């Protein structure tokens, strides 16, 4: 078995599509649609720092195939009223550390009220805290059985090293971990707060 790791790519889909492009492999419409979808989501709609001219060249290569790009965006980002209300109730629970790390801690009861799986709350809600003015690190803690799922994001700091400290990992500015309990989540919050404090 072989493993290909190249952290300079914004996404695995970008890496795969670039392989296909470079090697002259045939990419059918369905494959192009799937790869383009991964490129869009993992690049934050082409907004993250990892996006480069290579990203856009790969996107252009995929867009030469026949699929509905607008349908992808509609499926990913257009929401019904129930979903918007769910996000509003989530956002009402946002709290802040001393150094402005935004976070939400969702108990099992909170998850049940939202009518979503713990994974959907954890991964699906974390970016509702993105783009808050003055916030450069945000964390989403979600109870799942006897564990706590944690998603970390930042627009400025290397939060991956904090995730690794707690047995997790990911990317420089988008990482996660599975924690033992709420106390461990609070310890992680202190580490995130210290990370921001040391950079001020």
Where are the model-predicted features located?
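Short alpha-helices
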Residues: 1-58
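Hydrophobic helix-and-loop "lid/oligomerization" segment in the mid-to-C-terminal part
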Residues: 43-200
């Amino acid at each position: 078995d072989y493993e290909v790791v190249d952290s300079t790519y914004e996404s695995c889909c970008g890496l795969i599509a670039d392989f296909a492009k470079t090697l002259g492999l045939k990419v059918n419409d369905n494959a192009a649609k799937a790869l383009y979808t991964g490129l869009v989501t993992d690049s934050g709609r082409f907004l993250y720092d990892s996006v480069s001219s290579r990203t856009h060249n790969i996107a252009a290569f995929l867009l030469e195939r026949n699929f509905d790009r607008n349908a992808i965006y509609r499926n990913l980002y257009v929401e019904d009223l129930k979903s918007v209300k769910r996000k509003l109730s989530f956002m009402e629970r946002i709290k802040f550390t001393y150094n402005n790390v935004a976070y939400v801690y969702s108990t099992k009861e909170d998850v049940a009220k939202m009518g979503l799986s713990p994974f959907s709350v954890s991964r699906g809600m974390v970016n509702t805290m993105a783009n808050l003015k003055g916030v450069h690190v945000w964390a989403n803690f979600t109870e799942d059985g006897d564990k706590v799922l944690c998603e970390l994001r930042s627009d400025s700091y290397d939060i991956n090293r904090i995730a690794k400290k707690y047995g997790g990992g990911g990317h420089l500015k988008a990482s996660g971990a599975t924690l033992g309990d709420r106390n461990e989540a609070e310890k992680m919050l202190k580490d995130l707060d210290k990370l921001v404090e040391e950079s001020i």
